């Protein structure tokens, strides 16, 4: 049984990922593994000779010549949790085919001092990311003569992720936000603001939901934007979260709408009009919104839950920004398998994947 992915646990490690680069968007284009070179030493292999690491949060530079992503090294067998590798930020230069860990080039910052995820480029060779380093919060504590410990989330389970920026070489790290829960998936908008997903699960604003916020790149101007009273807008009243925002060419925002936990990583691509609405049923001026005005599904016939649909399931997606209104998506074809041992079929076909039909989706034997 697959352990569900939990959006409230961004530090989760799911070994088995590899980052590939295709030379062009065609089925027969050459595919190159650009991440495994980071772990070329045999010491990274497990007892079965497997190289099991994890990759997430891919983004590109403005000129398309560099890639940023987060990567976590293989687990150290028999090591305590505090001695395990953390999520680190890596950069791949497409022109030179070189891979580097951002903090490897610095003298004052250790890569393993915190989990670093969701990196993206800022103008001027700076990098925006979210991290458990909490550099400013630690500095304040030290100035007060206290231990510079990183804050835990309100459940006291894991260290809280907050927004940070740094130079391209990993120097001059600055903490932007101080949420007791997690601040995730920051992006720079065309208006110069930073848009991100905030888990509001502490204090007076607590609603145990992930909502959209904005902030200036210098840490000023924190502002709530959307979602606080819209978490029941999923299929069949599912409690959904607004994750991984992206700016569209028309100025609207696209998000991945999904429940906190998902066994399939499935999400509903959703377009939101932040200029005029603060919730699915509420305009900025306080008037009621007609259904479909504030938020609209980008792809019809898919849900925000793990439930199979005839149109399959969508995971990650990104707009192409070429005027075509197209998206690059990860998509899983709808498939079912027989589950009823009394079904009238060859026993050899029991449990084998089959293409979906409406009849099979409605059947109790699949």
Name each region found by the language model.
Residues 1-14, 70-87, 129-158, 196-210, ...:
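Short, conserved, GDST-rich strand-edge loop motifs in beta-rich repeat architectures
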Residues 2-49, 73-97, 151-154:
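Beta-propeller domains
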Residues 15, 54-56, 63, 85, ...:
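Beta-rich catalytic cores
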Residues 26-53, 95-114, 167-181, 219-240, ...:
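Multi-bladed beta-propeller domains
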Residues 62-63, 122-124, 189-191, 248-250, ...:
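Residue-level detector of Asp-centered blade-edge/turn motifs that repeat once per structural unit
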Residues 66, 126-127, 193-194, 252, ...:
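Conserved core beta-strand positions within WD40 beta-propeller blades
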Residues 75, 80-162, 171-184:
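Asp-box/WD-like beta-propeller blade repeats and closely related beta-sheet repeat scaffolds
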């Amino acid at each position: 049984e697959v352990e569900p992915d939990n959006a409230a646990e961004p530090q989760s490690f799911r070994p088995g990922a590899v980052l590939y680069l295709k030379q062009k968007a065609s089925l027969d284009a050459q595919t190159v593994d650009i991440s495994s070179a980071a772990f070329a030493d045999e010491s990274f292999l497990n007892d079965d000779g497997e190289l099991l690491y994890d990759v997430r949060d891919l983004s590109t530079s403005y000129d398309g010549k560099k890639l940023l992503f987060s990567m976590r090294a293989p687990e150290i067998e028999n090591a305590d949790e505090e001695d395990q590798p953390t999520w680190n930020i890596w950069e791949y230069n497409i022109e030179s085919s070189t891979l580097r860990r951002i903090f490897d080039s610095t003298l004052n910052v250790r890569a393993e001092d915190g989990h670093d995820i969701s990196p993206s480029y800022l103008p001027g060779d700076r990098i925006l990311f979210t991290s458990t380093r909490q550099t400013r919060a630690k500095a304040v504590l030290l100035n007060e003569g206290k231990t510079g410990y990183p804050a835990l989330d309100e459940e006291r389970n894991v260290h809280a992720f907050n927004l940070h920026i740094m130079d391209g070489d990993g120097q001059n790290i600055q903490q932007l936000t101080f949420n007791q829960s997690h601040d995730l998936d920051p992006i720079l908008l065309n208006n110069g603001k930073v848009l991100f997903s905030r888990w509001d699960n502490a204090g007076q604003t607590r609603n145990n939901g992930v909502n959209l916020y904005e902030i200036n790149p210098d840490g000023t101007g924190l502002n709530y934007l959307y979602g606080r009273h819209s978490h029941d807008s999923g299929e069949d009243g599912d409690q959904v979260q607004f994750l991984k925002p992206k700016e569209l060419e028309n100025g609207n925002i696209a998000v991945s709408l999904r429940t906190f936990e998902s066994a399939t990583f499935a999400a509903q691509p959703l377009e939101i009009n932040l200029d005029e609405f603060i919730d699915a049923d509420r305009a900025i001026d306080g008037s009621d919104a007609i259904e479909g005005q504030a938020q609209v599904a980008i792809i019809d016939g898919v849900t925000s839950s793990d439930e199979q649909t005839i149109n399959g399931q969508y995971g990650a997606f990104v707009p192409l920004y070429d005027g075509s209104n197209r998206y690059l998506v990860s998509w899983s074809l709808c498939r079912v398998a027989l589950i009823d041992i009394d079904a009238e079929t060859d026993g050899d076909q029991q449990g084998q994947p089959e293409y979906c039909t409406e009849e099979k989706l409605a059947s109790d034997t699949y």
